Amino acid sequence: MGVWSVVLYLLNTLIVPFRDERAKFEIERVSAEEAKKIIQMHNSQFVSAIGHSASANALSLLLGVAVPVNRTEVFFNVGDEAIAMALKKRLAEGQVLRTVQELEAVGFDLYYIKRVQ
């Protein structure tokens, strides 16, 4: 029987993909300081699923850890957690934010996500 380990993901979406038929998640808005504490509780070990350099750079500055750009698929298992960055407004079709300043101008919130079932 395999050993399950909890994964902490960094995401730039509130979408929470999973492979099972059903899942339950707890999601709460958090401050940058709270997000830093969560990362510290995981000994700064996380899987980046941040697909855009502006988002990765902003999170690196905000959270005090190096966040690599990594366009990868994520599927939550029970117990997995994430810090998600979500923009405060939808971008125009084809618009890409290329700098931290553009990202900050749009605004974003941070969320803590945990799959509980």
Swiss-Prot record:
Pfam families in the cross-refs: STIV_B116-like
Name of this protein: Uncharacterized protein ORF117
Organism: Acidianus two-tailed virus
